Amino acid sequence: MPIKSSDHSLYALFGGTFDPIHYGHLKPVEALAQQVGLQHIILLPNHVPPHRPQPEANAQQRLKMVELAVAGNPLFSVDSRELLRDSPSFTIETLEALRKERGAEQPLAFIIGQDSLLSLHKWHRWQALLDVCHLLVCARPGYSQSLETPELQQWLESHKVMDPQALSQRPHGAIYLADTPLLDISATDIRRRRHNGESCDDLLPQAVQRYIELQGLYRG
């Protein structure tokens, strides 16, 4: 049964490996919520396919870290559907399922980083994304502004909106390039710091740090 929205508030989905989740994930999307009027962000820990490099933390640990990171913050909820599957699913399939749950009129957005935008044409059914949701693009340190293919550049230009209010006025179909803070924090660097016994203070929430310590994660 679709969950109908009476006020057509803008909801967004933000996926990632989250190995571990950190402020480089959270701070930009919190700023994005302020900028575009997001009412809610659903965090979606990804199922990692066997042929790709495996996370150091297992699925249960990654899910727990995400839950701890946003506990008590009403802006966020956590959706574990991808982790509960036996095999990975394509992003478009998850978004289509969420669209069915939320109903046809709910404005929905998918948050991606600038790095993902540059390679979006390699995604499964990438051109169908805007039939289901909006795309919100967060800037990333060190990434080029130019897109790889003329087709992708033309697609971006034809769907780009400058006014974030447009995102709440229709359920899908727009791309918004957000002016979010550039935080040079990466999960790779956090894992390296842990392996080397270096401090990770101020890089991730304290509750996540405590859990990492208790579980003995990312040790050399």
Swiss-Prot record:
Pfam families assigned? CTP_transf_like
- Signal peptide coordinates: none
Q: Does the keyword Nucleotidyltransferase apply?
A: yes
This protein's record includes keyword Hydrolase: no
- What EC number(s) does the entry state? 2.7.7.18
Which of UniProt's keywords are assigned here?
Answer: ATP-binding, NAD, Nucleotide-binding, Nucleotidyltransferase, Pyridine nucleotide biosynthesis, Transferase
The pathway where this protein functions is:
Cofactor biosynthesis; NAD(+) biosynthesis; deamido-NAD(+) from nicotinate D-ribonucleotide: step 1/1
Q: Give coiled-coil spans as residue ranges.
A: none
Biological process (GO) annotations held by this record are: NAD biosynthetic process
Give the matching InterPro entries: Cyt_trans-like, NadD/NMNAT, Rossmann-like_a/b/a_fold
Sample GO molecular function, one term: nicotinate-nucleotide adenylyltransferase activity
* Reactions listed under catalytic activity: nicotinate beta-D-ribonucleotide + ATP + H(+) = deamido-NAD(+) + diphosphate
| The family this protein is said to belong to | Belongs to the NadD family.
Q: What does this protein do?
A: Catalyzes the reversible adenylation of nicotinate mononucleotide (NaMN) to nicotinic acid adenine dinucleotide (NaAD).
Q: What is this protein called?
A: Probable nicotinate-nucleotide adenylyltransferase
Write the gene name.
Answer: nadD
